[in-house]
Amino acid sequence: NLVDADDELVAVVNGKFGRRFKRIAQRHCEVTAVEFDWGNPIDVDAVAAAVSDDTEVVTLVHNETSTGLLNPAKEVGEIAADHDARFIVDGVTCIGGDEFLMDEWNVDIAVTDGQKALAAPPGVSALWVGEGVAKHLDGENAPFYEDLDWHRRKADQHQTPFTSAIPLIRGLAVAVEEIRHEGMGERIGRHREQSAAFREAMEALGLTLFAQCNDVSDYSNTLTAVRLPEGARGEDSDAFFDAVADRGVSISGGQAHLGGDIFRVSNMGNLTTAQLARGVRTIGEAFNEVGVDADTAAGVDAVETRLR
């Protein structure tokens, strides 16, 4: 909708979902990828060096859940705006659970899904398209279903271009009403406190966080990535994940080349302190079961003390 085949796009990549954004763009235009090792913070100077007045679009995943890192949307947005480039941000795992300032960050298009921090059923997505970028849309060059001009016209009529997924939209409406009831500020604060408590708990267990932060990148407030310790890495990780599942708790492993190296735990949605403490206890007990020393009591105490 925003590029032709010979247009230039800069994709910022430091995880699986940034890489996916890059691969999507490569099907439609010329792409310059500014890539960093997964889990490492973004060097905004490197991004600034890659973006020029010829750049049409800059893409960024704000909350990279493959690594548990919150990327610097504000700083990258300023770079895009300095060159009059459109700024497209993947906000899938932060919108509804963390701050997302579209105007202040110069965001032109934001993307999210229902099933992440909004805590709605999977299957429904949403785009926010800024008025300033609407005039740049060219639906004729987009796949038929993804013609944003068409979607915008239908949205003005409170419709979708094709048959609406009414049950999913109603589910999303209920989830949004729950957010309204809690209050957006309170919800963001809760996610931040819960993620901080979980990180403290992992360190109390004797574990090491995976993401590397700097002055403009920070830990994700909706998901934590943790290094698997010796004795539960690589092929040995299967026994750990089985021990967690046997206790009725669901966590995720690393994606792509990080499989067997890390595990990931989400605190998106409507978790309680008791649920978070149960998750920490389960992780500690699972490590102990497979022969890894973890101070389960200290981990649970860290969560309960922080969130008391």
Residue positions per predicted region:
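PLP-dependent aminotransferase-like
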Residues: 2-56
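Active-site phosphate-binding strand-loop segment of PLP-dependent enzymes
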Residues: 42-96
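Conserved active-site segment immediately N-terminal to the catalytic lysine
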Residues: 103-115
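Active-site C-terminal subdomain of aminotransferase-like
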Residues: 115-204, 308
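Conserved PLP-binding catalytic core of the aspartate aminotransferase-like
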Residues: 208-243
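Conserved PLP cofactor-binding pocket of PLP-dependent enzymes
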Residues: 247-264
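PLP-dependent enzyme catalytic core of the Aspartate aminotransferase-like
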Residues: 261-308
